[in-house]
A protein has these predicted regions:
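Ligand-binding clefts/hinges and TM-proximal coupling segments of bilobed small-molecule sensing domains
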Residues: 31, 159-175, 211-214, 243-280
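Periplasmic-binding protein-like
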Residues: 49, 127-135, 196, 200, ...
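Short helix-initiation/N-cap motifs at beta->coil->alpha
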Residues: 84-95, 157, 172-186, 220-222
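A conserved helix-loop-strand patch within extracytoplasmic ligand-binding domains
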Residues: 31, 81-85, 109-111, 115, ...
Length: 280
């Protein structure tokens, strides 16, 4: 089913169980990445800095900011490593990880079965994100099905390409979300589909986007995970308790608030309750 409508409480145990099961299927042999991080005290993390509350450039300081940036820095702090942020794009982020240009990916890349077959990942998700479409307020598009046979902009490598293709839309894929959104404003497509956490704040807070609205419900909501290379079980095992504790302590909820992510994710509340109950 393309558009998820099930309650968060029912979905999270299923998703979490699936993630843990798939991680267990990866190689159990020791990996070199964790050894390298511990020896060099450097952690290379690929992040998207294309704008929005998960990753962008602060216009005042010209430094990276966002929830993904905060999470990368917190992982580095707990590992005793200096964090080197490496900007990536949807079109090249997997290659950067596979080629060893980064140790981890925290790059707006939600879990899918296809991605789980070629990469490794920390089993506990740190967020849950679905897609939405920005369309003109006077557009006749009111449902996802209305996009059939219409030109729709998105990013290359986006997890939304597959469900959009199944809806029968004409995909126009760009290197970044910024280019995709610019194409929408240039009337090159009838909608631009990206993470709801990017689209919603943009439409709510930016004057030049006041003529646009977002579609609901979210398209294909999925868990956001930290990606590793396949078979790096040591790295995953080292990071998973950290992510659980960030849920239990409320750090991730605080990071969501600090970065003004709206609407707030009910998944974070559910995961916090779970790990507090489990004593994680």
């Amino acid at each position: 089913m393309l558009i998820e409508r099930s309650p968060v409480k029912r979905l999270l145990p299923v998703m979490l169980g699936a993630l843990i099961s798939m991680v267990g299927m990866t190689s159990a042999q020791a990996d070199a990445t964790l050894d390298k991080i511990q020896q060099r005290h450097v952690l290379g993390v690929g992040v998207l800095l294309s704008g929005g509350p998960f990753g962008g450039i602060d216009p005042t300081t010209q430094k990276p900011r966002g929830l993904n940036v905060d999470l990368a820095q917190e992982l580095g702090r707990q590992l005793g490593a200096e964090v080197q942020l490496v900007p990536v794009l949807p079109a090249n982020r997997v290659q950067f990880l596979q080629q060893g240009k980064v140790d981890l990916l925290i790059a707006n890349m939600e879990w899918t079965a296809e991605r789980g077959e070629i990469l490794g990942f920390v089993p506990t998700p740190f967020y849950r994100v679905g897609g939405t479409a920005a369309v003109l307020k006077d557009s006749k598009i009111s449902r996802w099905e209305d996009l059939k046979d219409q030109p729709v902009c998105t990013s290359q490598g986006s997890s939304y390409v597959k469900p959009l293709t199944e809806l029968g839309v004409e995909i126009k894929a760009f290197k970044s979300s910024s280019e995709s959104l610019l194409a929408l404003r240039g009337n090159n497509c009838v909608a631009a589909v990206h993470d709801a956490t990017l689209i919603n704040p943009l439409l709510a807070d930016t004057a030049e986007w006041q003529g646009y609205r977002a579609l609901s419900p979210e398209l294909n909501p999925a868990p956001s995970v930290i990606w590793t290379r396949r078979g790096e079980g040591d790295t995953q095992a080292r990071l998973d308790p950290i992510v659980k504790e960030l849920h239990r302590s409320g750090w991730l909820i605080d990071a969501q608030t600090r970065n003004r992510i709206t609407p707030a994710s009910p998944a974070l509340v559910e995961l916090q309750k779970r790990f507090q109950a489990n004593g994680a």
